[in-house]
């Protein structure tokens, strides 16, 4: 069975932790390195407690260099929104390495990235070298709406009520992400202006 050698940039956050959990349990995935400048040198399980006993890897302080890149097939970018574009502008990644970005930076399919919703364009994604992972709200809404749009049965406006958890805001603290505020509470979040609306419109237009 083929093994894909994988590197992760930004592995200390919530997105990186969940990706690590999935990859460590995937039979075709082999982790080569997990980069985190804030946790460099620390065991991964110290940050992601649920991975205790799953891996002995420590967070890397720097990217591979030179021929070390030959041991990497796929690179995941799990940095915050706006950081992936900056990362690729300043770092030289060999062109034969597939890049999968989990931020919002390339979901508009800029810079050679393909929008990574398999239900929309599975074969295109298979051939792509750069893939932009869809947003959470966008994915859930597209899976419901795109089949209706493709069948041309959408005759009026679509109204969606969606609720996200605390982790959607990342690890950085703010007044509205504390448990004492979130517990048993709900609030309106970017109604009619959410950034995922552009993704959904783009996908519908592509049909």
Features from the language model and the residues they span:
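N-terminal Rossmann-like NAD(P) cofactor-binding subdomain of oxidoreductases
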Residues: 1-191
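Oxyanion-binding "anion nests"
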Residues: 192-207
């Amino acid at each position: 069975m083929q093994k894909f050698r994988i590197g992760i940039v930004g592995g200390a956050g919530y997105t990186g932790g969940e990706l690590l959990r999935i990859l460590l349990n995937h039979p075709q995935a082999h982790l080569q390195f997990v980069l985190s400048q804030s946790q460099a040198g620390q065991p991964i399980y110290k940050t992601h407690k649920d991975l205790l006993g799953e891996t002995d890897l420590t967070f890397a302080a720097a990217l591979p260099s030179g021929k070390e890149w030959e041991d990497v097939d796929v690179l995941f970018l799990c940095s915050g929104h706006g950081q992936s574009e900056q990362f690729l502008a300043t770092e030289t990644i060999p062109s034969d390495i597939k890049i999968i970005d989990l931020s919002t930076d390339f979901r508009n399919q800029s810079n050679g990235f393909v929008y990574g919703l398999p239900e929309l364009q599975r074969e295109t994604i298979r051939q792509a070298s750069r893939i932009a992972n869809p947003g959470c709200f966008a994915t859930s809404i597209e899976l419901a709406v795109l089949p209706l749009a493709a069948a041309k049965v959408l005759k009026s406006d679509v109204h969606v009520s969606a609720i996200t958890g605390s982790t959607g805001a990342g690890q950085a603290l703010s007044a509205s992400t504390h448990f004492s505020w979130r517990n048993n509470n709900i609030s309106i979040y970017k109604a009619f202006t959410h950034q995922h609306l552009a993704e959904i419109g783009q996908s519908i237009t592509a049909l």
